[in-house]
Amino acid sequence: MKPFTFYEAIESNKRKTWFIVFIIYFLLFFVCYAVVSYFELGEIGIIIAFLIVLFTNYYAYQKSNEIILNYSGVREPTREEYPYLLNVVEGLSIAAGIPTPKIYIMDDPSPNAFATGKDPQNSVVVVTKGLLDILNRTELEGVIAHEISHIKNYDVRLQTIAAVMVGLIVILGDGLKRSFYYSKRRRDKDENILGIVSLIIAILAPFLATLLRFALSRQREYMADASAAMLTRYPEGLASALEKIAKNFQPIKRANVMTAPLYIVNPLSSNAVSKLFSTHPPIEERIRRLRMMGERWKMLDKEG
């Protein structure tokens, strides 16, 4: 396979990301339409469904930072405690052209990190004590550049909205299934095409939406890797950091299925989990792509 540049990797992932987002919104519209049609709610039902989507997106957008940090049990470090960490974050933030995010430490031995925040002006980078214990400065720069790239690319906002959309699809789909099976109207709809179609949508849409959310998370990880490599101009730093993280991996106690997509590597035990259901790409593949970018960069330097 031909090595690719940072720019090619980023543009490819942008296209894939927006395609996935479009499909998730289409599925949500499809499920809302099925619910409205099945219960004969008419225009009022469509308006109500739209308002529900609008409100849940707004609430998640405003409160996601506070909820995630409180649940994760993080603390703010002093400059005397981790001066090099604060210096790295400040330097890379300036290079990325964003305000310096707040820094928090999670006292967990597992090496990991994540970023959160609705926009670059209200962003946070969290690193575990385990990460700081095993990485050298170059590797730490790669990890922090990855998290800053998530912030600059508005990935937290995107992931939050996607999670809300998928959650709504699951809730509406489940409600539609229950109504089909248990309501009195079932006897009148056994042979009704609309009822059968609604049931099929209720079964398939939540499953497909969940797969798409995982696919979206994987694409944003690839994009953050490429953006981090472009920011540091040294893909090997992040590649080496990922190798160390994988070697020293252990599950994070305070992580859950909702916060897992935020981390640089999946913080949960991944025993027998299919690639389709993974929130993160395989670490080996991420390392391979980063090193391919490094090779391409060296080739371009020689040609130039």
From Swiss-Prot:
It comes from the Bacteria. The chain crosses the membrane at residues 19-39, 41-61, 156-176, 192-212. Zn(2+) binds at H146, H150, E221. The keyword Transport does not apply. GO terms for molecular function: metalloendopeptidase activity; zinc ion binding. One of its GO terms (cellular component) is plasma membrane. This is Protease HtpX homolog. It comes from Dictyoglomus turgidum (strain DSM 6724 / Z-1310). The gene is htpX.
